[in-house]
Amino acid sequence: MDTRLLVIAAPVLVAASWALFNIGRLAIQQIQRLSR
């Protein structure tokens, strides 16, 4: 594994997981609001 590749991949993975986490949390809030 090339170190430079890891340096590039790590922030991308962090950003992607953070975005998915936020989208999932918003989706759950919307579903809870609709189900009420």
Swiss-Prot record:
Thylakoid in keyword set: yes
A Gene Ontology BP annotation from the UniProt entry: photosynthesis
Pfam families xrefs: PsbY
InterPro entries reported for this sequence: PSII_PsbY
Membrane topology designation: Single-pass membrane protein
Transmembrane segments: 5-23
Domain of life: Eukaryota
Molecular function, one GO term: manganese ion binding
Location(s) in or outside the cell: Plastid, Chloroplast thylakoid membrane
Keywords, ordered alphabetically: Chloroplast, Membrane, Photosynthesis, Photosystem II, Plastid, Thylakoid, Transmembrane, Transmembrane helix
Lumenal compartment segments: 1-4
UniProt keyword annotation of Membrane present: yes
UniProt function note: Loosely associated component of the core of photosystem II (PSII), it is not always seen in crystals. PSII is a light-driven water plastoquinone oxidoreductase, using light energy to abstract electrons from H(2)O, generating a proton gradient subsequently used for ATP formation.
NCBIfam families: PRK13240.1
Subunit structure: PSII is composed of 1 copy each of membrane proteins PsbA, PsbB, PsbC, PsbD, PsbE, PsbF, PsbH, PsbI, PsbJ, PsbK, PsbL, PsbM, PsbT, PsbX, PsbY, PsbZ, Psb30/Ycf12, at least 3 peripheral proteins of the oxygen-evolving complex and a large number of cofactors. It forms dimeric complexes.
Annotated protein name in UniProt: Photosystem II reaction center protein Y
Organism this protein belongs to: Thalassiosira pseudonana
